[in-house]
């Protein structure tokens, strides 16, 4: 997952084949496990937030809950946006590196990061990047509600981070504003606990679907690397000697 690809032949019998569950170069586990850790952190943050909100609500019963929880819900949306970025960027880089030379290339990594920049925080640009690089159209594999929820998470996150959680002209130009306009109480936007639950559900759906798309593409590209390794060895006798 860091761009290092190695061939480790464990056994010639198919029934005994095995593989590492981590990268022996950088120590990272899979992108999916990394996302699972992010989701676990989100659950911890959400749990602590709900305890805090309940405690404050008992002392401020006259204040609407969404106002008391405004900052808490913003933190949770930012965390969901981080999960989305990890999902798209890490899977993209893993597929790209295994498609290239079977070794880490720092120059290639710099080119990728320079070209993509923060594009993986833009859902529509992400769809375009995957389509151009791998022929994968993410949008076609997600239902309309999930796609819109991902857009909403990122647009809300941008408003929260860049304008202190207050509705601005840039946010008003987004599709999210059109879907949430009944929630707007200038300069704030009304976010409820149910909204967070719905957005989380869509993130989990997206993680599941995109992870399956990734695995299908990954195995195909991995097998090409392995086949290319064997069929392009300089000396066929060396190949058979290595397998003895």
Features from the language model and the residues they span:
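Flexible secondary-structure boundary motifs
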Residues: 1, 13, 96-185
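Polyanionic, low-complexity intrinsically disordered segments
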Residues: 1-44, 166-244
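Short, charged, low-complexity loops and linkers
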Residues: 25-30, 66-70, 107-113
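Intrinsically disordered, low-complexity segments
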Residues: 34-63
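A long, hydrophobic alpha-helical segment
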Residues: 55-77, 132-145
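Short, hydrophobic, well-ordered secondary-structure elements
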Residues: 70-96, 161
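Charged, amphipathic alpha-helical oligomerization/scaffolding segments
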Residues: 79, 83, 149-159, 195-198, ...
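Perimembrane helix-loop junctions in membrane proteins
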Residues: 89-100, 212, 216-219
């Amino acid at each position: 997952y860091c761009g290092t690809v190695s061939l480790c032949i464990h056994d010639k019998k198919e029934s005994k084949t095995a593989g590492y569950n981590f990268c022996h170069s950088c120590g990272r586990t899979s992108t999916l496990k990394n996302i699972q850790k992010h989701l676990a952190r989100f659950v911890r943050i959400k749990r602590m937030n709900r305890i805090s909100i309940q405690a404050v609500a008992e002392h401020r019963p006259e204040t609407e809950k969404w106002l008391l929880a405004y900052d808490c819900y913003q933190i949770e949306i930012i965390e969901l946006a981080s999960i989305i970025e990890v999902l798209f960027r890490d899977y993209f880089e893993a597929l790209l590196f295994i498609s290239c030379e079977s070794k880490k290339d720092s120059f290639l990594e710099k080119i990728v990061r320079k070209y993509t920049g923060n594009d993986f925080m833009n859902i529509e640009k992400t769809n375009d990047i995957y389509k151009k690089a791998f022929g994968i159209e993410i949008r076609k594999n997600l239902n309309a509600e999930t796609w819109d929820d991902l857009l909403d998470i990122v647009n809300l996150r941008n408003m929260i981070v860049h304008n202190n959680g207050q509705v601005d002209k840039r946010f008003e130009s987004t599709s999210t504003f059109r879907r949430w306009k009944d929630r707007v109480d200038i300069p704030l936007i009304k976010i409820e606990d149910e909204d967070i639950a719905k957005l989380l559900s869509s993130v989990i759906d997206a993680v599941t679907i995109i992870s399956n798309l990734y695995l299908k593409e990954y195995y195909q590209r991995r097998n090409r690397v392995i086949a290319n390794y064997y069929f392009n060895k300089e000396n066929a006798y060396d190949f058979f000697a290595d397998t003895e």
